[in-house]
Structure formats: C-alpha cells, structure tokens
C-alpha cells in the first residue's frame, strides 16, 4: 500500500483554516483524514473532544512531550498544542492523506522533520489584516487582550509565508478551498506518475 501524503495547512489565527479545511474535506476523492491535535486549552462551545481536538490536562501533555510522543508541539497564549506522532504515521501507513491544520511554530517543527515529495505545506493568508481582525472579533470567544495578542502574532507570522510550498489567499471560501484541492490533486498525480515509472 502506498503511503499517504502529509498536508500541512498553516496561517494566522482567525484566517479561516478550519472553515477552509471543512470545505476541502467534502471532496472524498482526495482520501483526506484530519489529524486531530492535542491541546491543554478549554474547548470552545461547539468543539468536541476527539473530533476538533484531543483535550488533555497540562500534566498529561507535558508527560507525553517528555516521552517524545509528538511530531510537534508548541505553547501559545497560555496553552500547549501538539500533533500526536503515532496517530499521524498510522493514518499515512494506511494510505490516507493526512491533513494537519496547525499553528506556524508547530508547522516549522513538522516541516524540519518531514521532508520529501509526499509532504505539502500550504500557508493561508487573509486578504488584509483588517479582515483578519474582523474575523477574530466575530468569534466573540476571547477577551480583547487575547485578540490583540493574536493580531500582533499574525503580523509576524505572515512574514513566514514564503517558507511554504504554496500561499493561498482566503478572500473567498470556494476559491481558497478549490485552490487547495488543486494543489493536493496535482501532488497525488505527480506521485502516481513517479510510481508508474519505477
């Protein structure tokens, strides 16, 4: 069985990563599976454990980190976020294309460890910083000081976009998700052709 792709989607907080991912996942021909991150933060109202994130205590998270059980992990706004290593490898070995939706710091770590034609990195950017602020405030899930911290970090993170294979502007949900689907299909086809040549 052919090993699946690893697709890394990053972008600043509030850019719409989750919304775009959900739209991309509607295309079953891509054989995508979402890699669920582990976090110590509290769930938002609509989030479910084991679906949106694996929610754990800080003690549990730090124990797993000490045992090198994460492909990557990072600390952001008082909480830890990480990608369980064994979970991702199991899915890829089953031939599934694993989709990571992670913060930039975590993506840097993953991309330093995972290289090759079966890894795709995509950076999602907002059409403007003003639009990004509107989206974050529209969540109504965080106090103003956290929003300001997220916006300041977003400005720094956007400067990192050129380190990714692709940059996609999320100015329109359909257009952004279509572009990401094209990127994935192109890489799948390229790897199929390389396999046929062997």
Describe the residue ranges of each PLM region.
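Phosphate-binding P-loop
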Residues: 1-4
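Short hydrophobic/aromatic beta-strand immediately N-terminal to the Walker A/P-loop
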Residues: 6-10
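Conserved glycine(s) of the Walker
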Residues: 11, 16
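Short, well-ordered alpha-helical microsegments
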Residues: 17, 106-108, 176-177
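N-terminal phosphate/diphosphate-binding loop that engages ATP/GTP or pyrophosphate donors
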Residues: 18, 22-69
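Short aromatic/basic micro-patch
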Residues: 54-56, 82, 101, 167
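ATP-dependent NMP and nucleoside kinases share a basic, alpha-helical "lid"
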Residues: 60-69, 83-140, 184
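NTP-dependent small-molecule kinase module
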Residues: 138-142, 156-198
């Amino acid at each position: 069985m052919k090993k699946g792709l690893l697709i890394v989607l990053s972008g600043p907080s509030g850019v719409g990563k989750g919304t775009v991912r959900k739209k991309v996942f509607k295309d079953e021909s891509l054989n995508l599976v979402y890699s669920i991150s582990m976090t110590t933060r509290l769930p938002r109202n609509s989030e479910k454990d084991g679906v949106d994130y694996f929610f754990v205590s800080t003690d549990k998270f730090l124990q797993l980190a000490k045992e090198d059980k994460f492909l990557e992990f990072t600390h952001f706004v008082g909480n830890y976020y990480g990608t369980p290593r064994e979970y991702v490898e199991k899915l890829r070995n089953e031939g599934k294309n694993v989709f990571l939706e992670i913060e930039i710091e975590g993506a840097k770590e993953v991309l330093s460890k995972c290289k090759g034609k079966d890894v795709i990195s995509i950076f999602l950017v907002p059409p403007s910083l003003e639009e990004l602020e509107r989206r974050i405030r529209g969540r109504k899930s965080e106090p103003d000081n956290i929003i300001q911290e997220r916006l300041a970090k977003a400005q720094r993170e956007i400067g990192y976009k050129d380190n990714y294979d692709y940059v996609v502007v999320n100015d329109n949900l359909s257009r952004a998700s279509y572009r990401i689907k094209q990127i994935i299909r192109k890489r799948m086809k390229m790897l199929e052709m390389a396999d046929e040549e062997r």
